[in-house]
Regions:
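A glycine-rich, Thr/Ser-enriched phosphate-binding loop motif common to dinucleotide/cofactor-binding enzymes
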Residues: 1-14, 27-35
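Short hydrophobic alpha-helical segments of the AMP-binding
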Residues: 13, 36, 40, 127
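Short helix-loop-beta connector
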Residues: 17-23
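Adenosine-nucleotide cofactor-binding segment
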Residues: 23-29, 39-104
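Short, well-ordered coil/turn residues at beta-beta hairpins
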Residues: 93-96, 118, 189
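C-terminal hydrophobic helical "lid"/dimerization subdomain
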Residues: 103, 145-189
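Helix-to-beta-strand junctions that scaffold the AdoMet/dcAdoMet cofactor pocket
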Residues: 109-111
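Rossmann-fold dehydrogenase core element
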Residues: 114-116, 124-162
């Protein structure tokens, strides 16, 4: 998981230009998002985890996230709740492969903020005068691999996995699709 999820999470956090006390929201707490929480915390960021599943937010809490928000189907209500309880974010990272979530992330950051999109999908329309930056990123380089290994060793990153025998690969995929796995599924031959 470090060479796929770990590198993707690391690269996305780096793209968000982390620094101490920067308010970063992570949309999509699963196989990649749970790693991003840890990388952002190592950088000293104030991290908010956003997911539609409570069980994923429980994982985020165990990993030290500062705030958790349940993503609701009403974008307007979600944004009002976040702004009222916490204020807008400095940056957001999107791992959830849903265009509406990307749109919500863009709307959840301050003027001058940044959204890092680390998934596939379309970038919704946004207003240029809000001075927001949108960056795309996926996977990383050989140097990123070295950095992830070093950071993992020095900080004891926790990779949350659920294992399945290879014969249950289809079951694992169905569980992943239905968000029934806390983070990463690993097949064992």
């Amino acid at each position: 998981p470090l060479f796929c999820a770990g590198i993707t999470a690391y690269k996305a956090v780096k793209a968000a230009e982390p620094k101490k006390n920067k308010k970063i929201a992570i949309f999509g707490i699963g196989g990649v998002g749970h790693m991003a929480i840890q990388f952002a915390k190592i950088e000293g960021c104030e991290v908010s985890a956003i997911s539609r599943k409570e069980k994923h937010l429980d994982v985020a809490k165990k990993l030290g996230t500062d705030n958790v928000f349940v993503y609701s189907s009403s974008q307007e209500q979600f944004l009002q709740d976040v702004d009222k309880k916490y204020g807008l974010f400095d940056a957001a990272i999107v791992f959830a492969p849903v265009d509406e979530v990307t749109d919500t992330a863009i709307k959840s950051i301050k003027k001058g903020g940044m959204v890092v999109v680390a998934t596939v999908g379309k970038i919704p329309n946004f207003l240029a005068f809000e001075e927001k930056t949108i960056r795309g990123t996926l996977i990383g380089s050989r140097k990123d691999m070295e950095d992830v290994i070093k950071i993992s060793d020095e900080n004891k990153l926790e990779v949350v996995t659920e294992t399945f025998p290879l014969e249950q690969a289809n079951e694992a995929l169905i569980k992943l699709k239905n968000s029934e796995i806390d983070a990463r599924a690993v097949l064992i031959p």
